[in-house]
Amino acid sequence: MRLILLSSLLLLGIFLANGDEVDPDGKVLNSLIYGVMHLQREFANLKGAFLTVHRARSFGSGSERLYVTNKEIKNFEALRQICEQAEGHIPSPQLENQNKAFANVLERHGKEAYLVVGDSANFTNWAAGEPNKAAGTCVKADTHGSWHSASCDDNLLVVCEFYFIL
């Protein structure tokens, strides 16, 4: 959409610079102006619709991050590839409300899922006795949102995290 808008503006600039030679009666210029105005309205409408859907999806959880599953069961490496292909991320809750939103997905499906914990995480939700490196080098969340050490070879629910910066 932005590419079309920018292309239209470029054409508009060309016509403004060479207007009389290329478009003596101004019909092409007026058509371009109308087209650019139409694209601007369409872009504003799409942005508004997107923000409405995003706010609705994040309303119940209070989290600006969305946690979505495709209902597949995969190991950590497969999860990484799936989330990357979907232009998402492996879940990495940074706040309690984000962890709750993530846990809501797990609870609905009655399954555990992988997450990643950053080295500088201010928020953690480790279960009692965790982290336990003997259990594995990956981390999984249970249906209550508690974190546990896990083997990266375990097959768990695929959940990807999506967030939007506007």
Curated annotation (Swiss-Prot):
Subcellular location(s): the record lists: Secreted
> A GO molecular function for this record?
carbohydrate binding
Spell out the Gene3D superfamilies in the cross-references. Answer: Mannose-Binding Protein A, subunit A
Query: Does the keyword field hold Ribosomal protein?
Result: no
- What keywords tag this UniProt record? Calcium, Disulfide bond, Glycoprotein, Lectin, Phospholipase A2 inhibitor, Secreted, Signal
Q: Which SUPFAM superfamilies match?
A: C-type lectin-like
Per the record, the domain of life is: Eukaryota
Q: In which tissues is it expressed?
A: Expressed by the liver.
Instruction: Indicate the secretion signal residues.
Output: 1-19
Q: InterPro entries, from UniProt?
A: C-type_lectin-like (IPR001304), C-type_lectin-like/link_sf (IPR016186), C-type_lectin_CS (IPR018378), CTDL_fold (IPR016187)
Please give the positions of the paired cysteines in each disulfide bond.
C83-C160, C138-C152
Q: Which cellular component appears as one GO term in the record?
A: extracellular region
Q: Please state what the protein is called.
A: Phospholipase A2 inhibitor clone 08
Give the source species: Bothrops moojeni (Lance-headed viper)
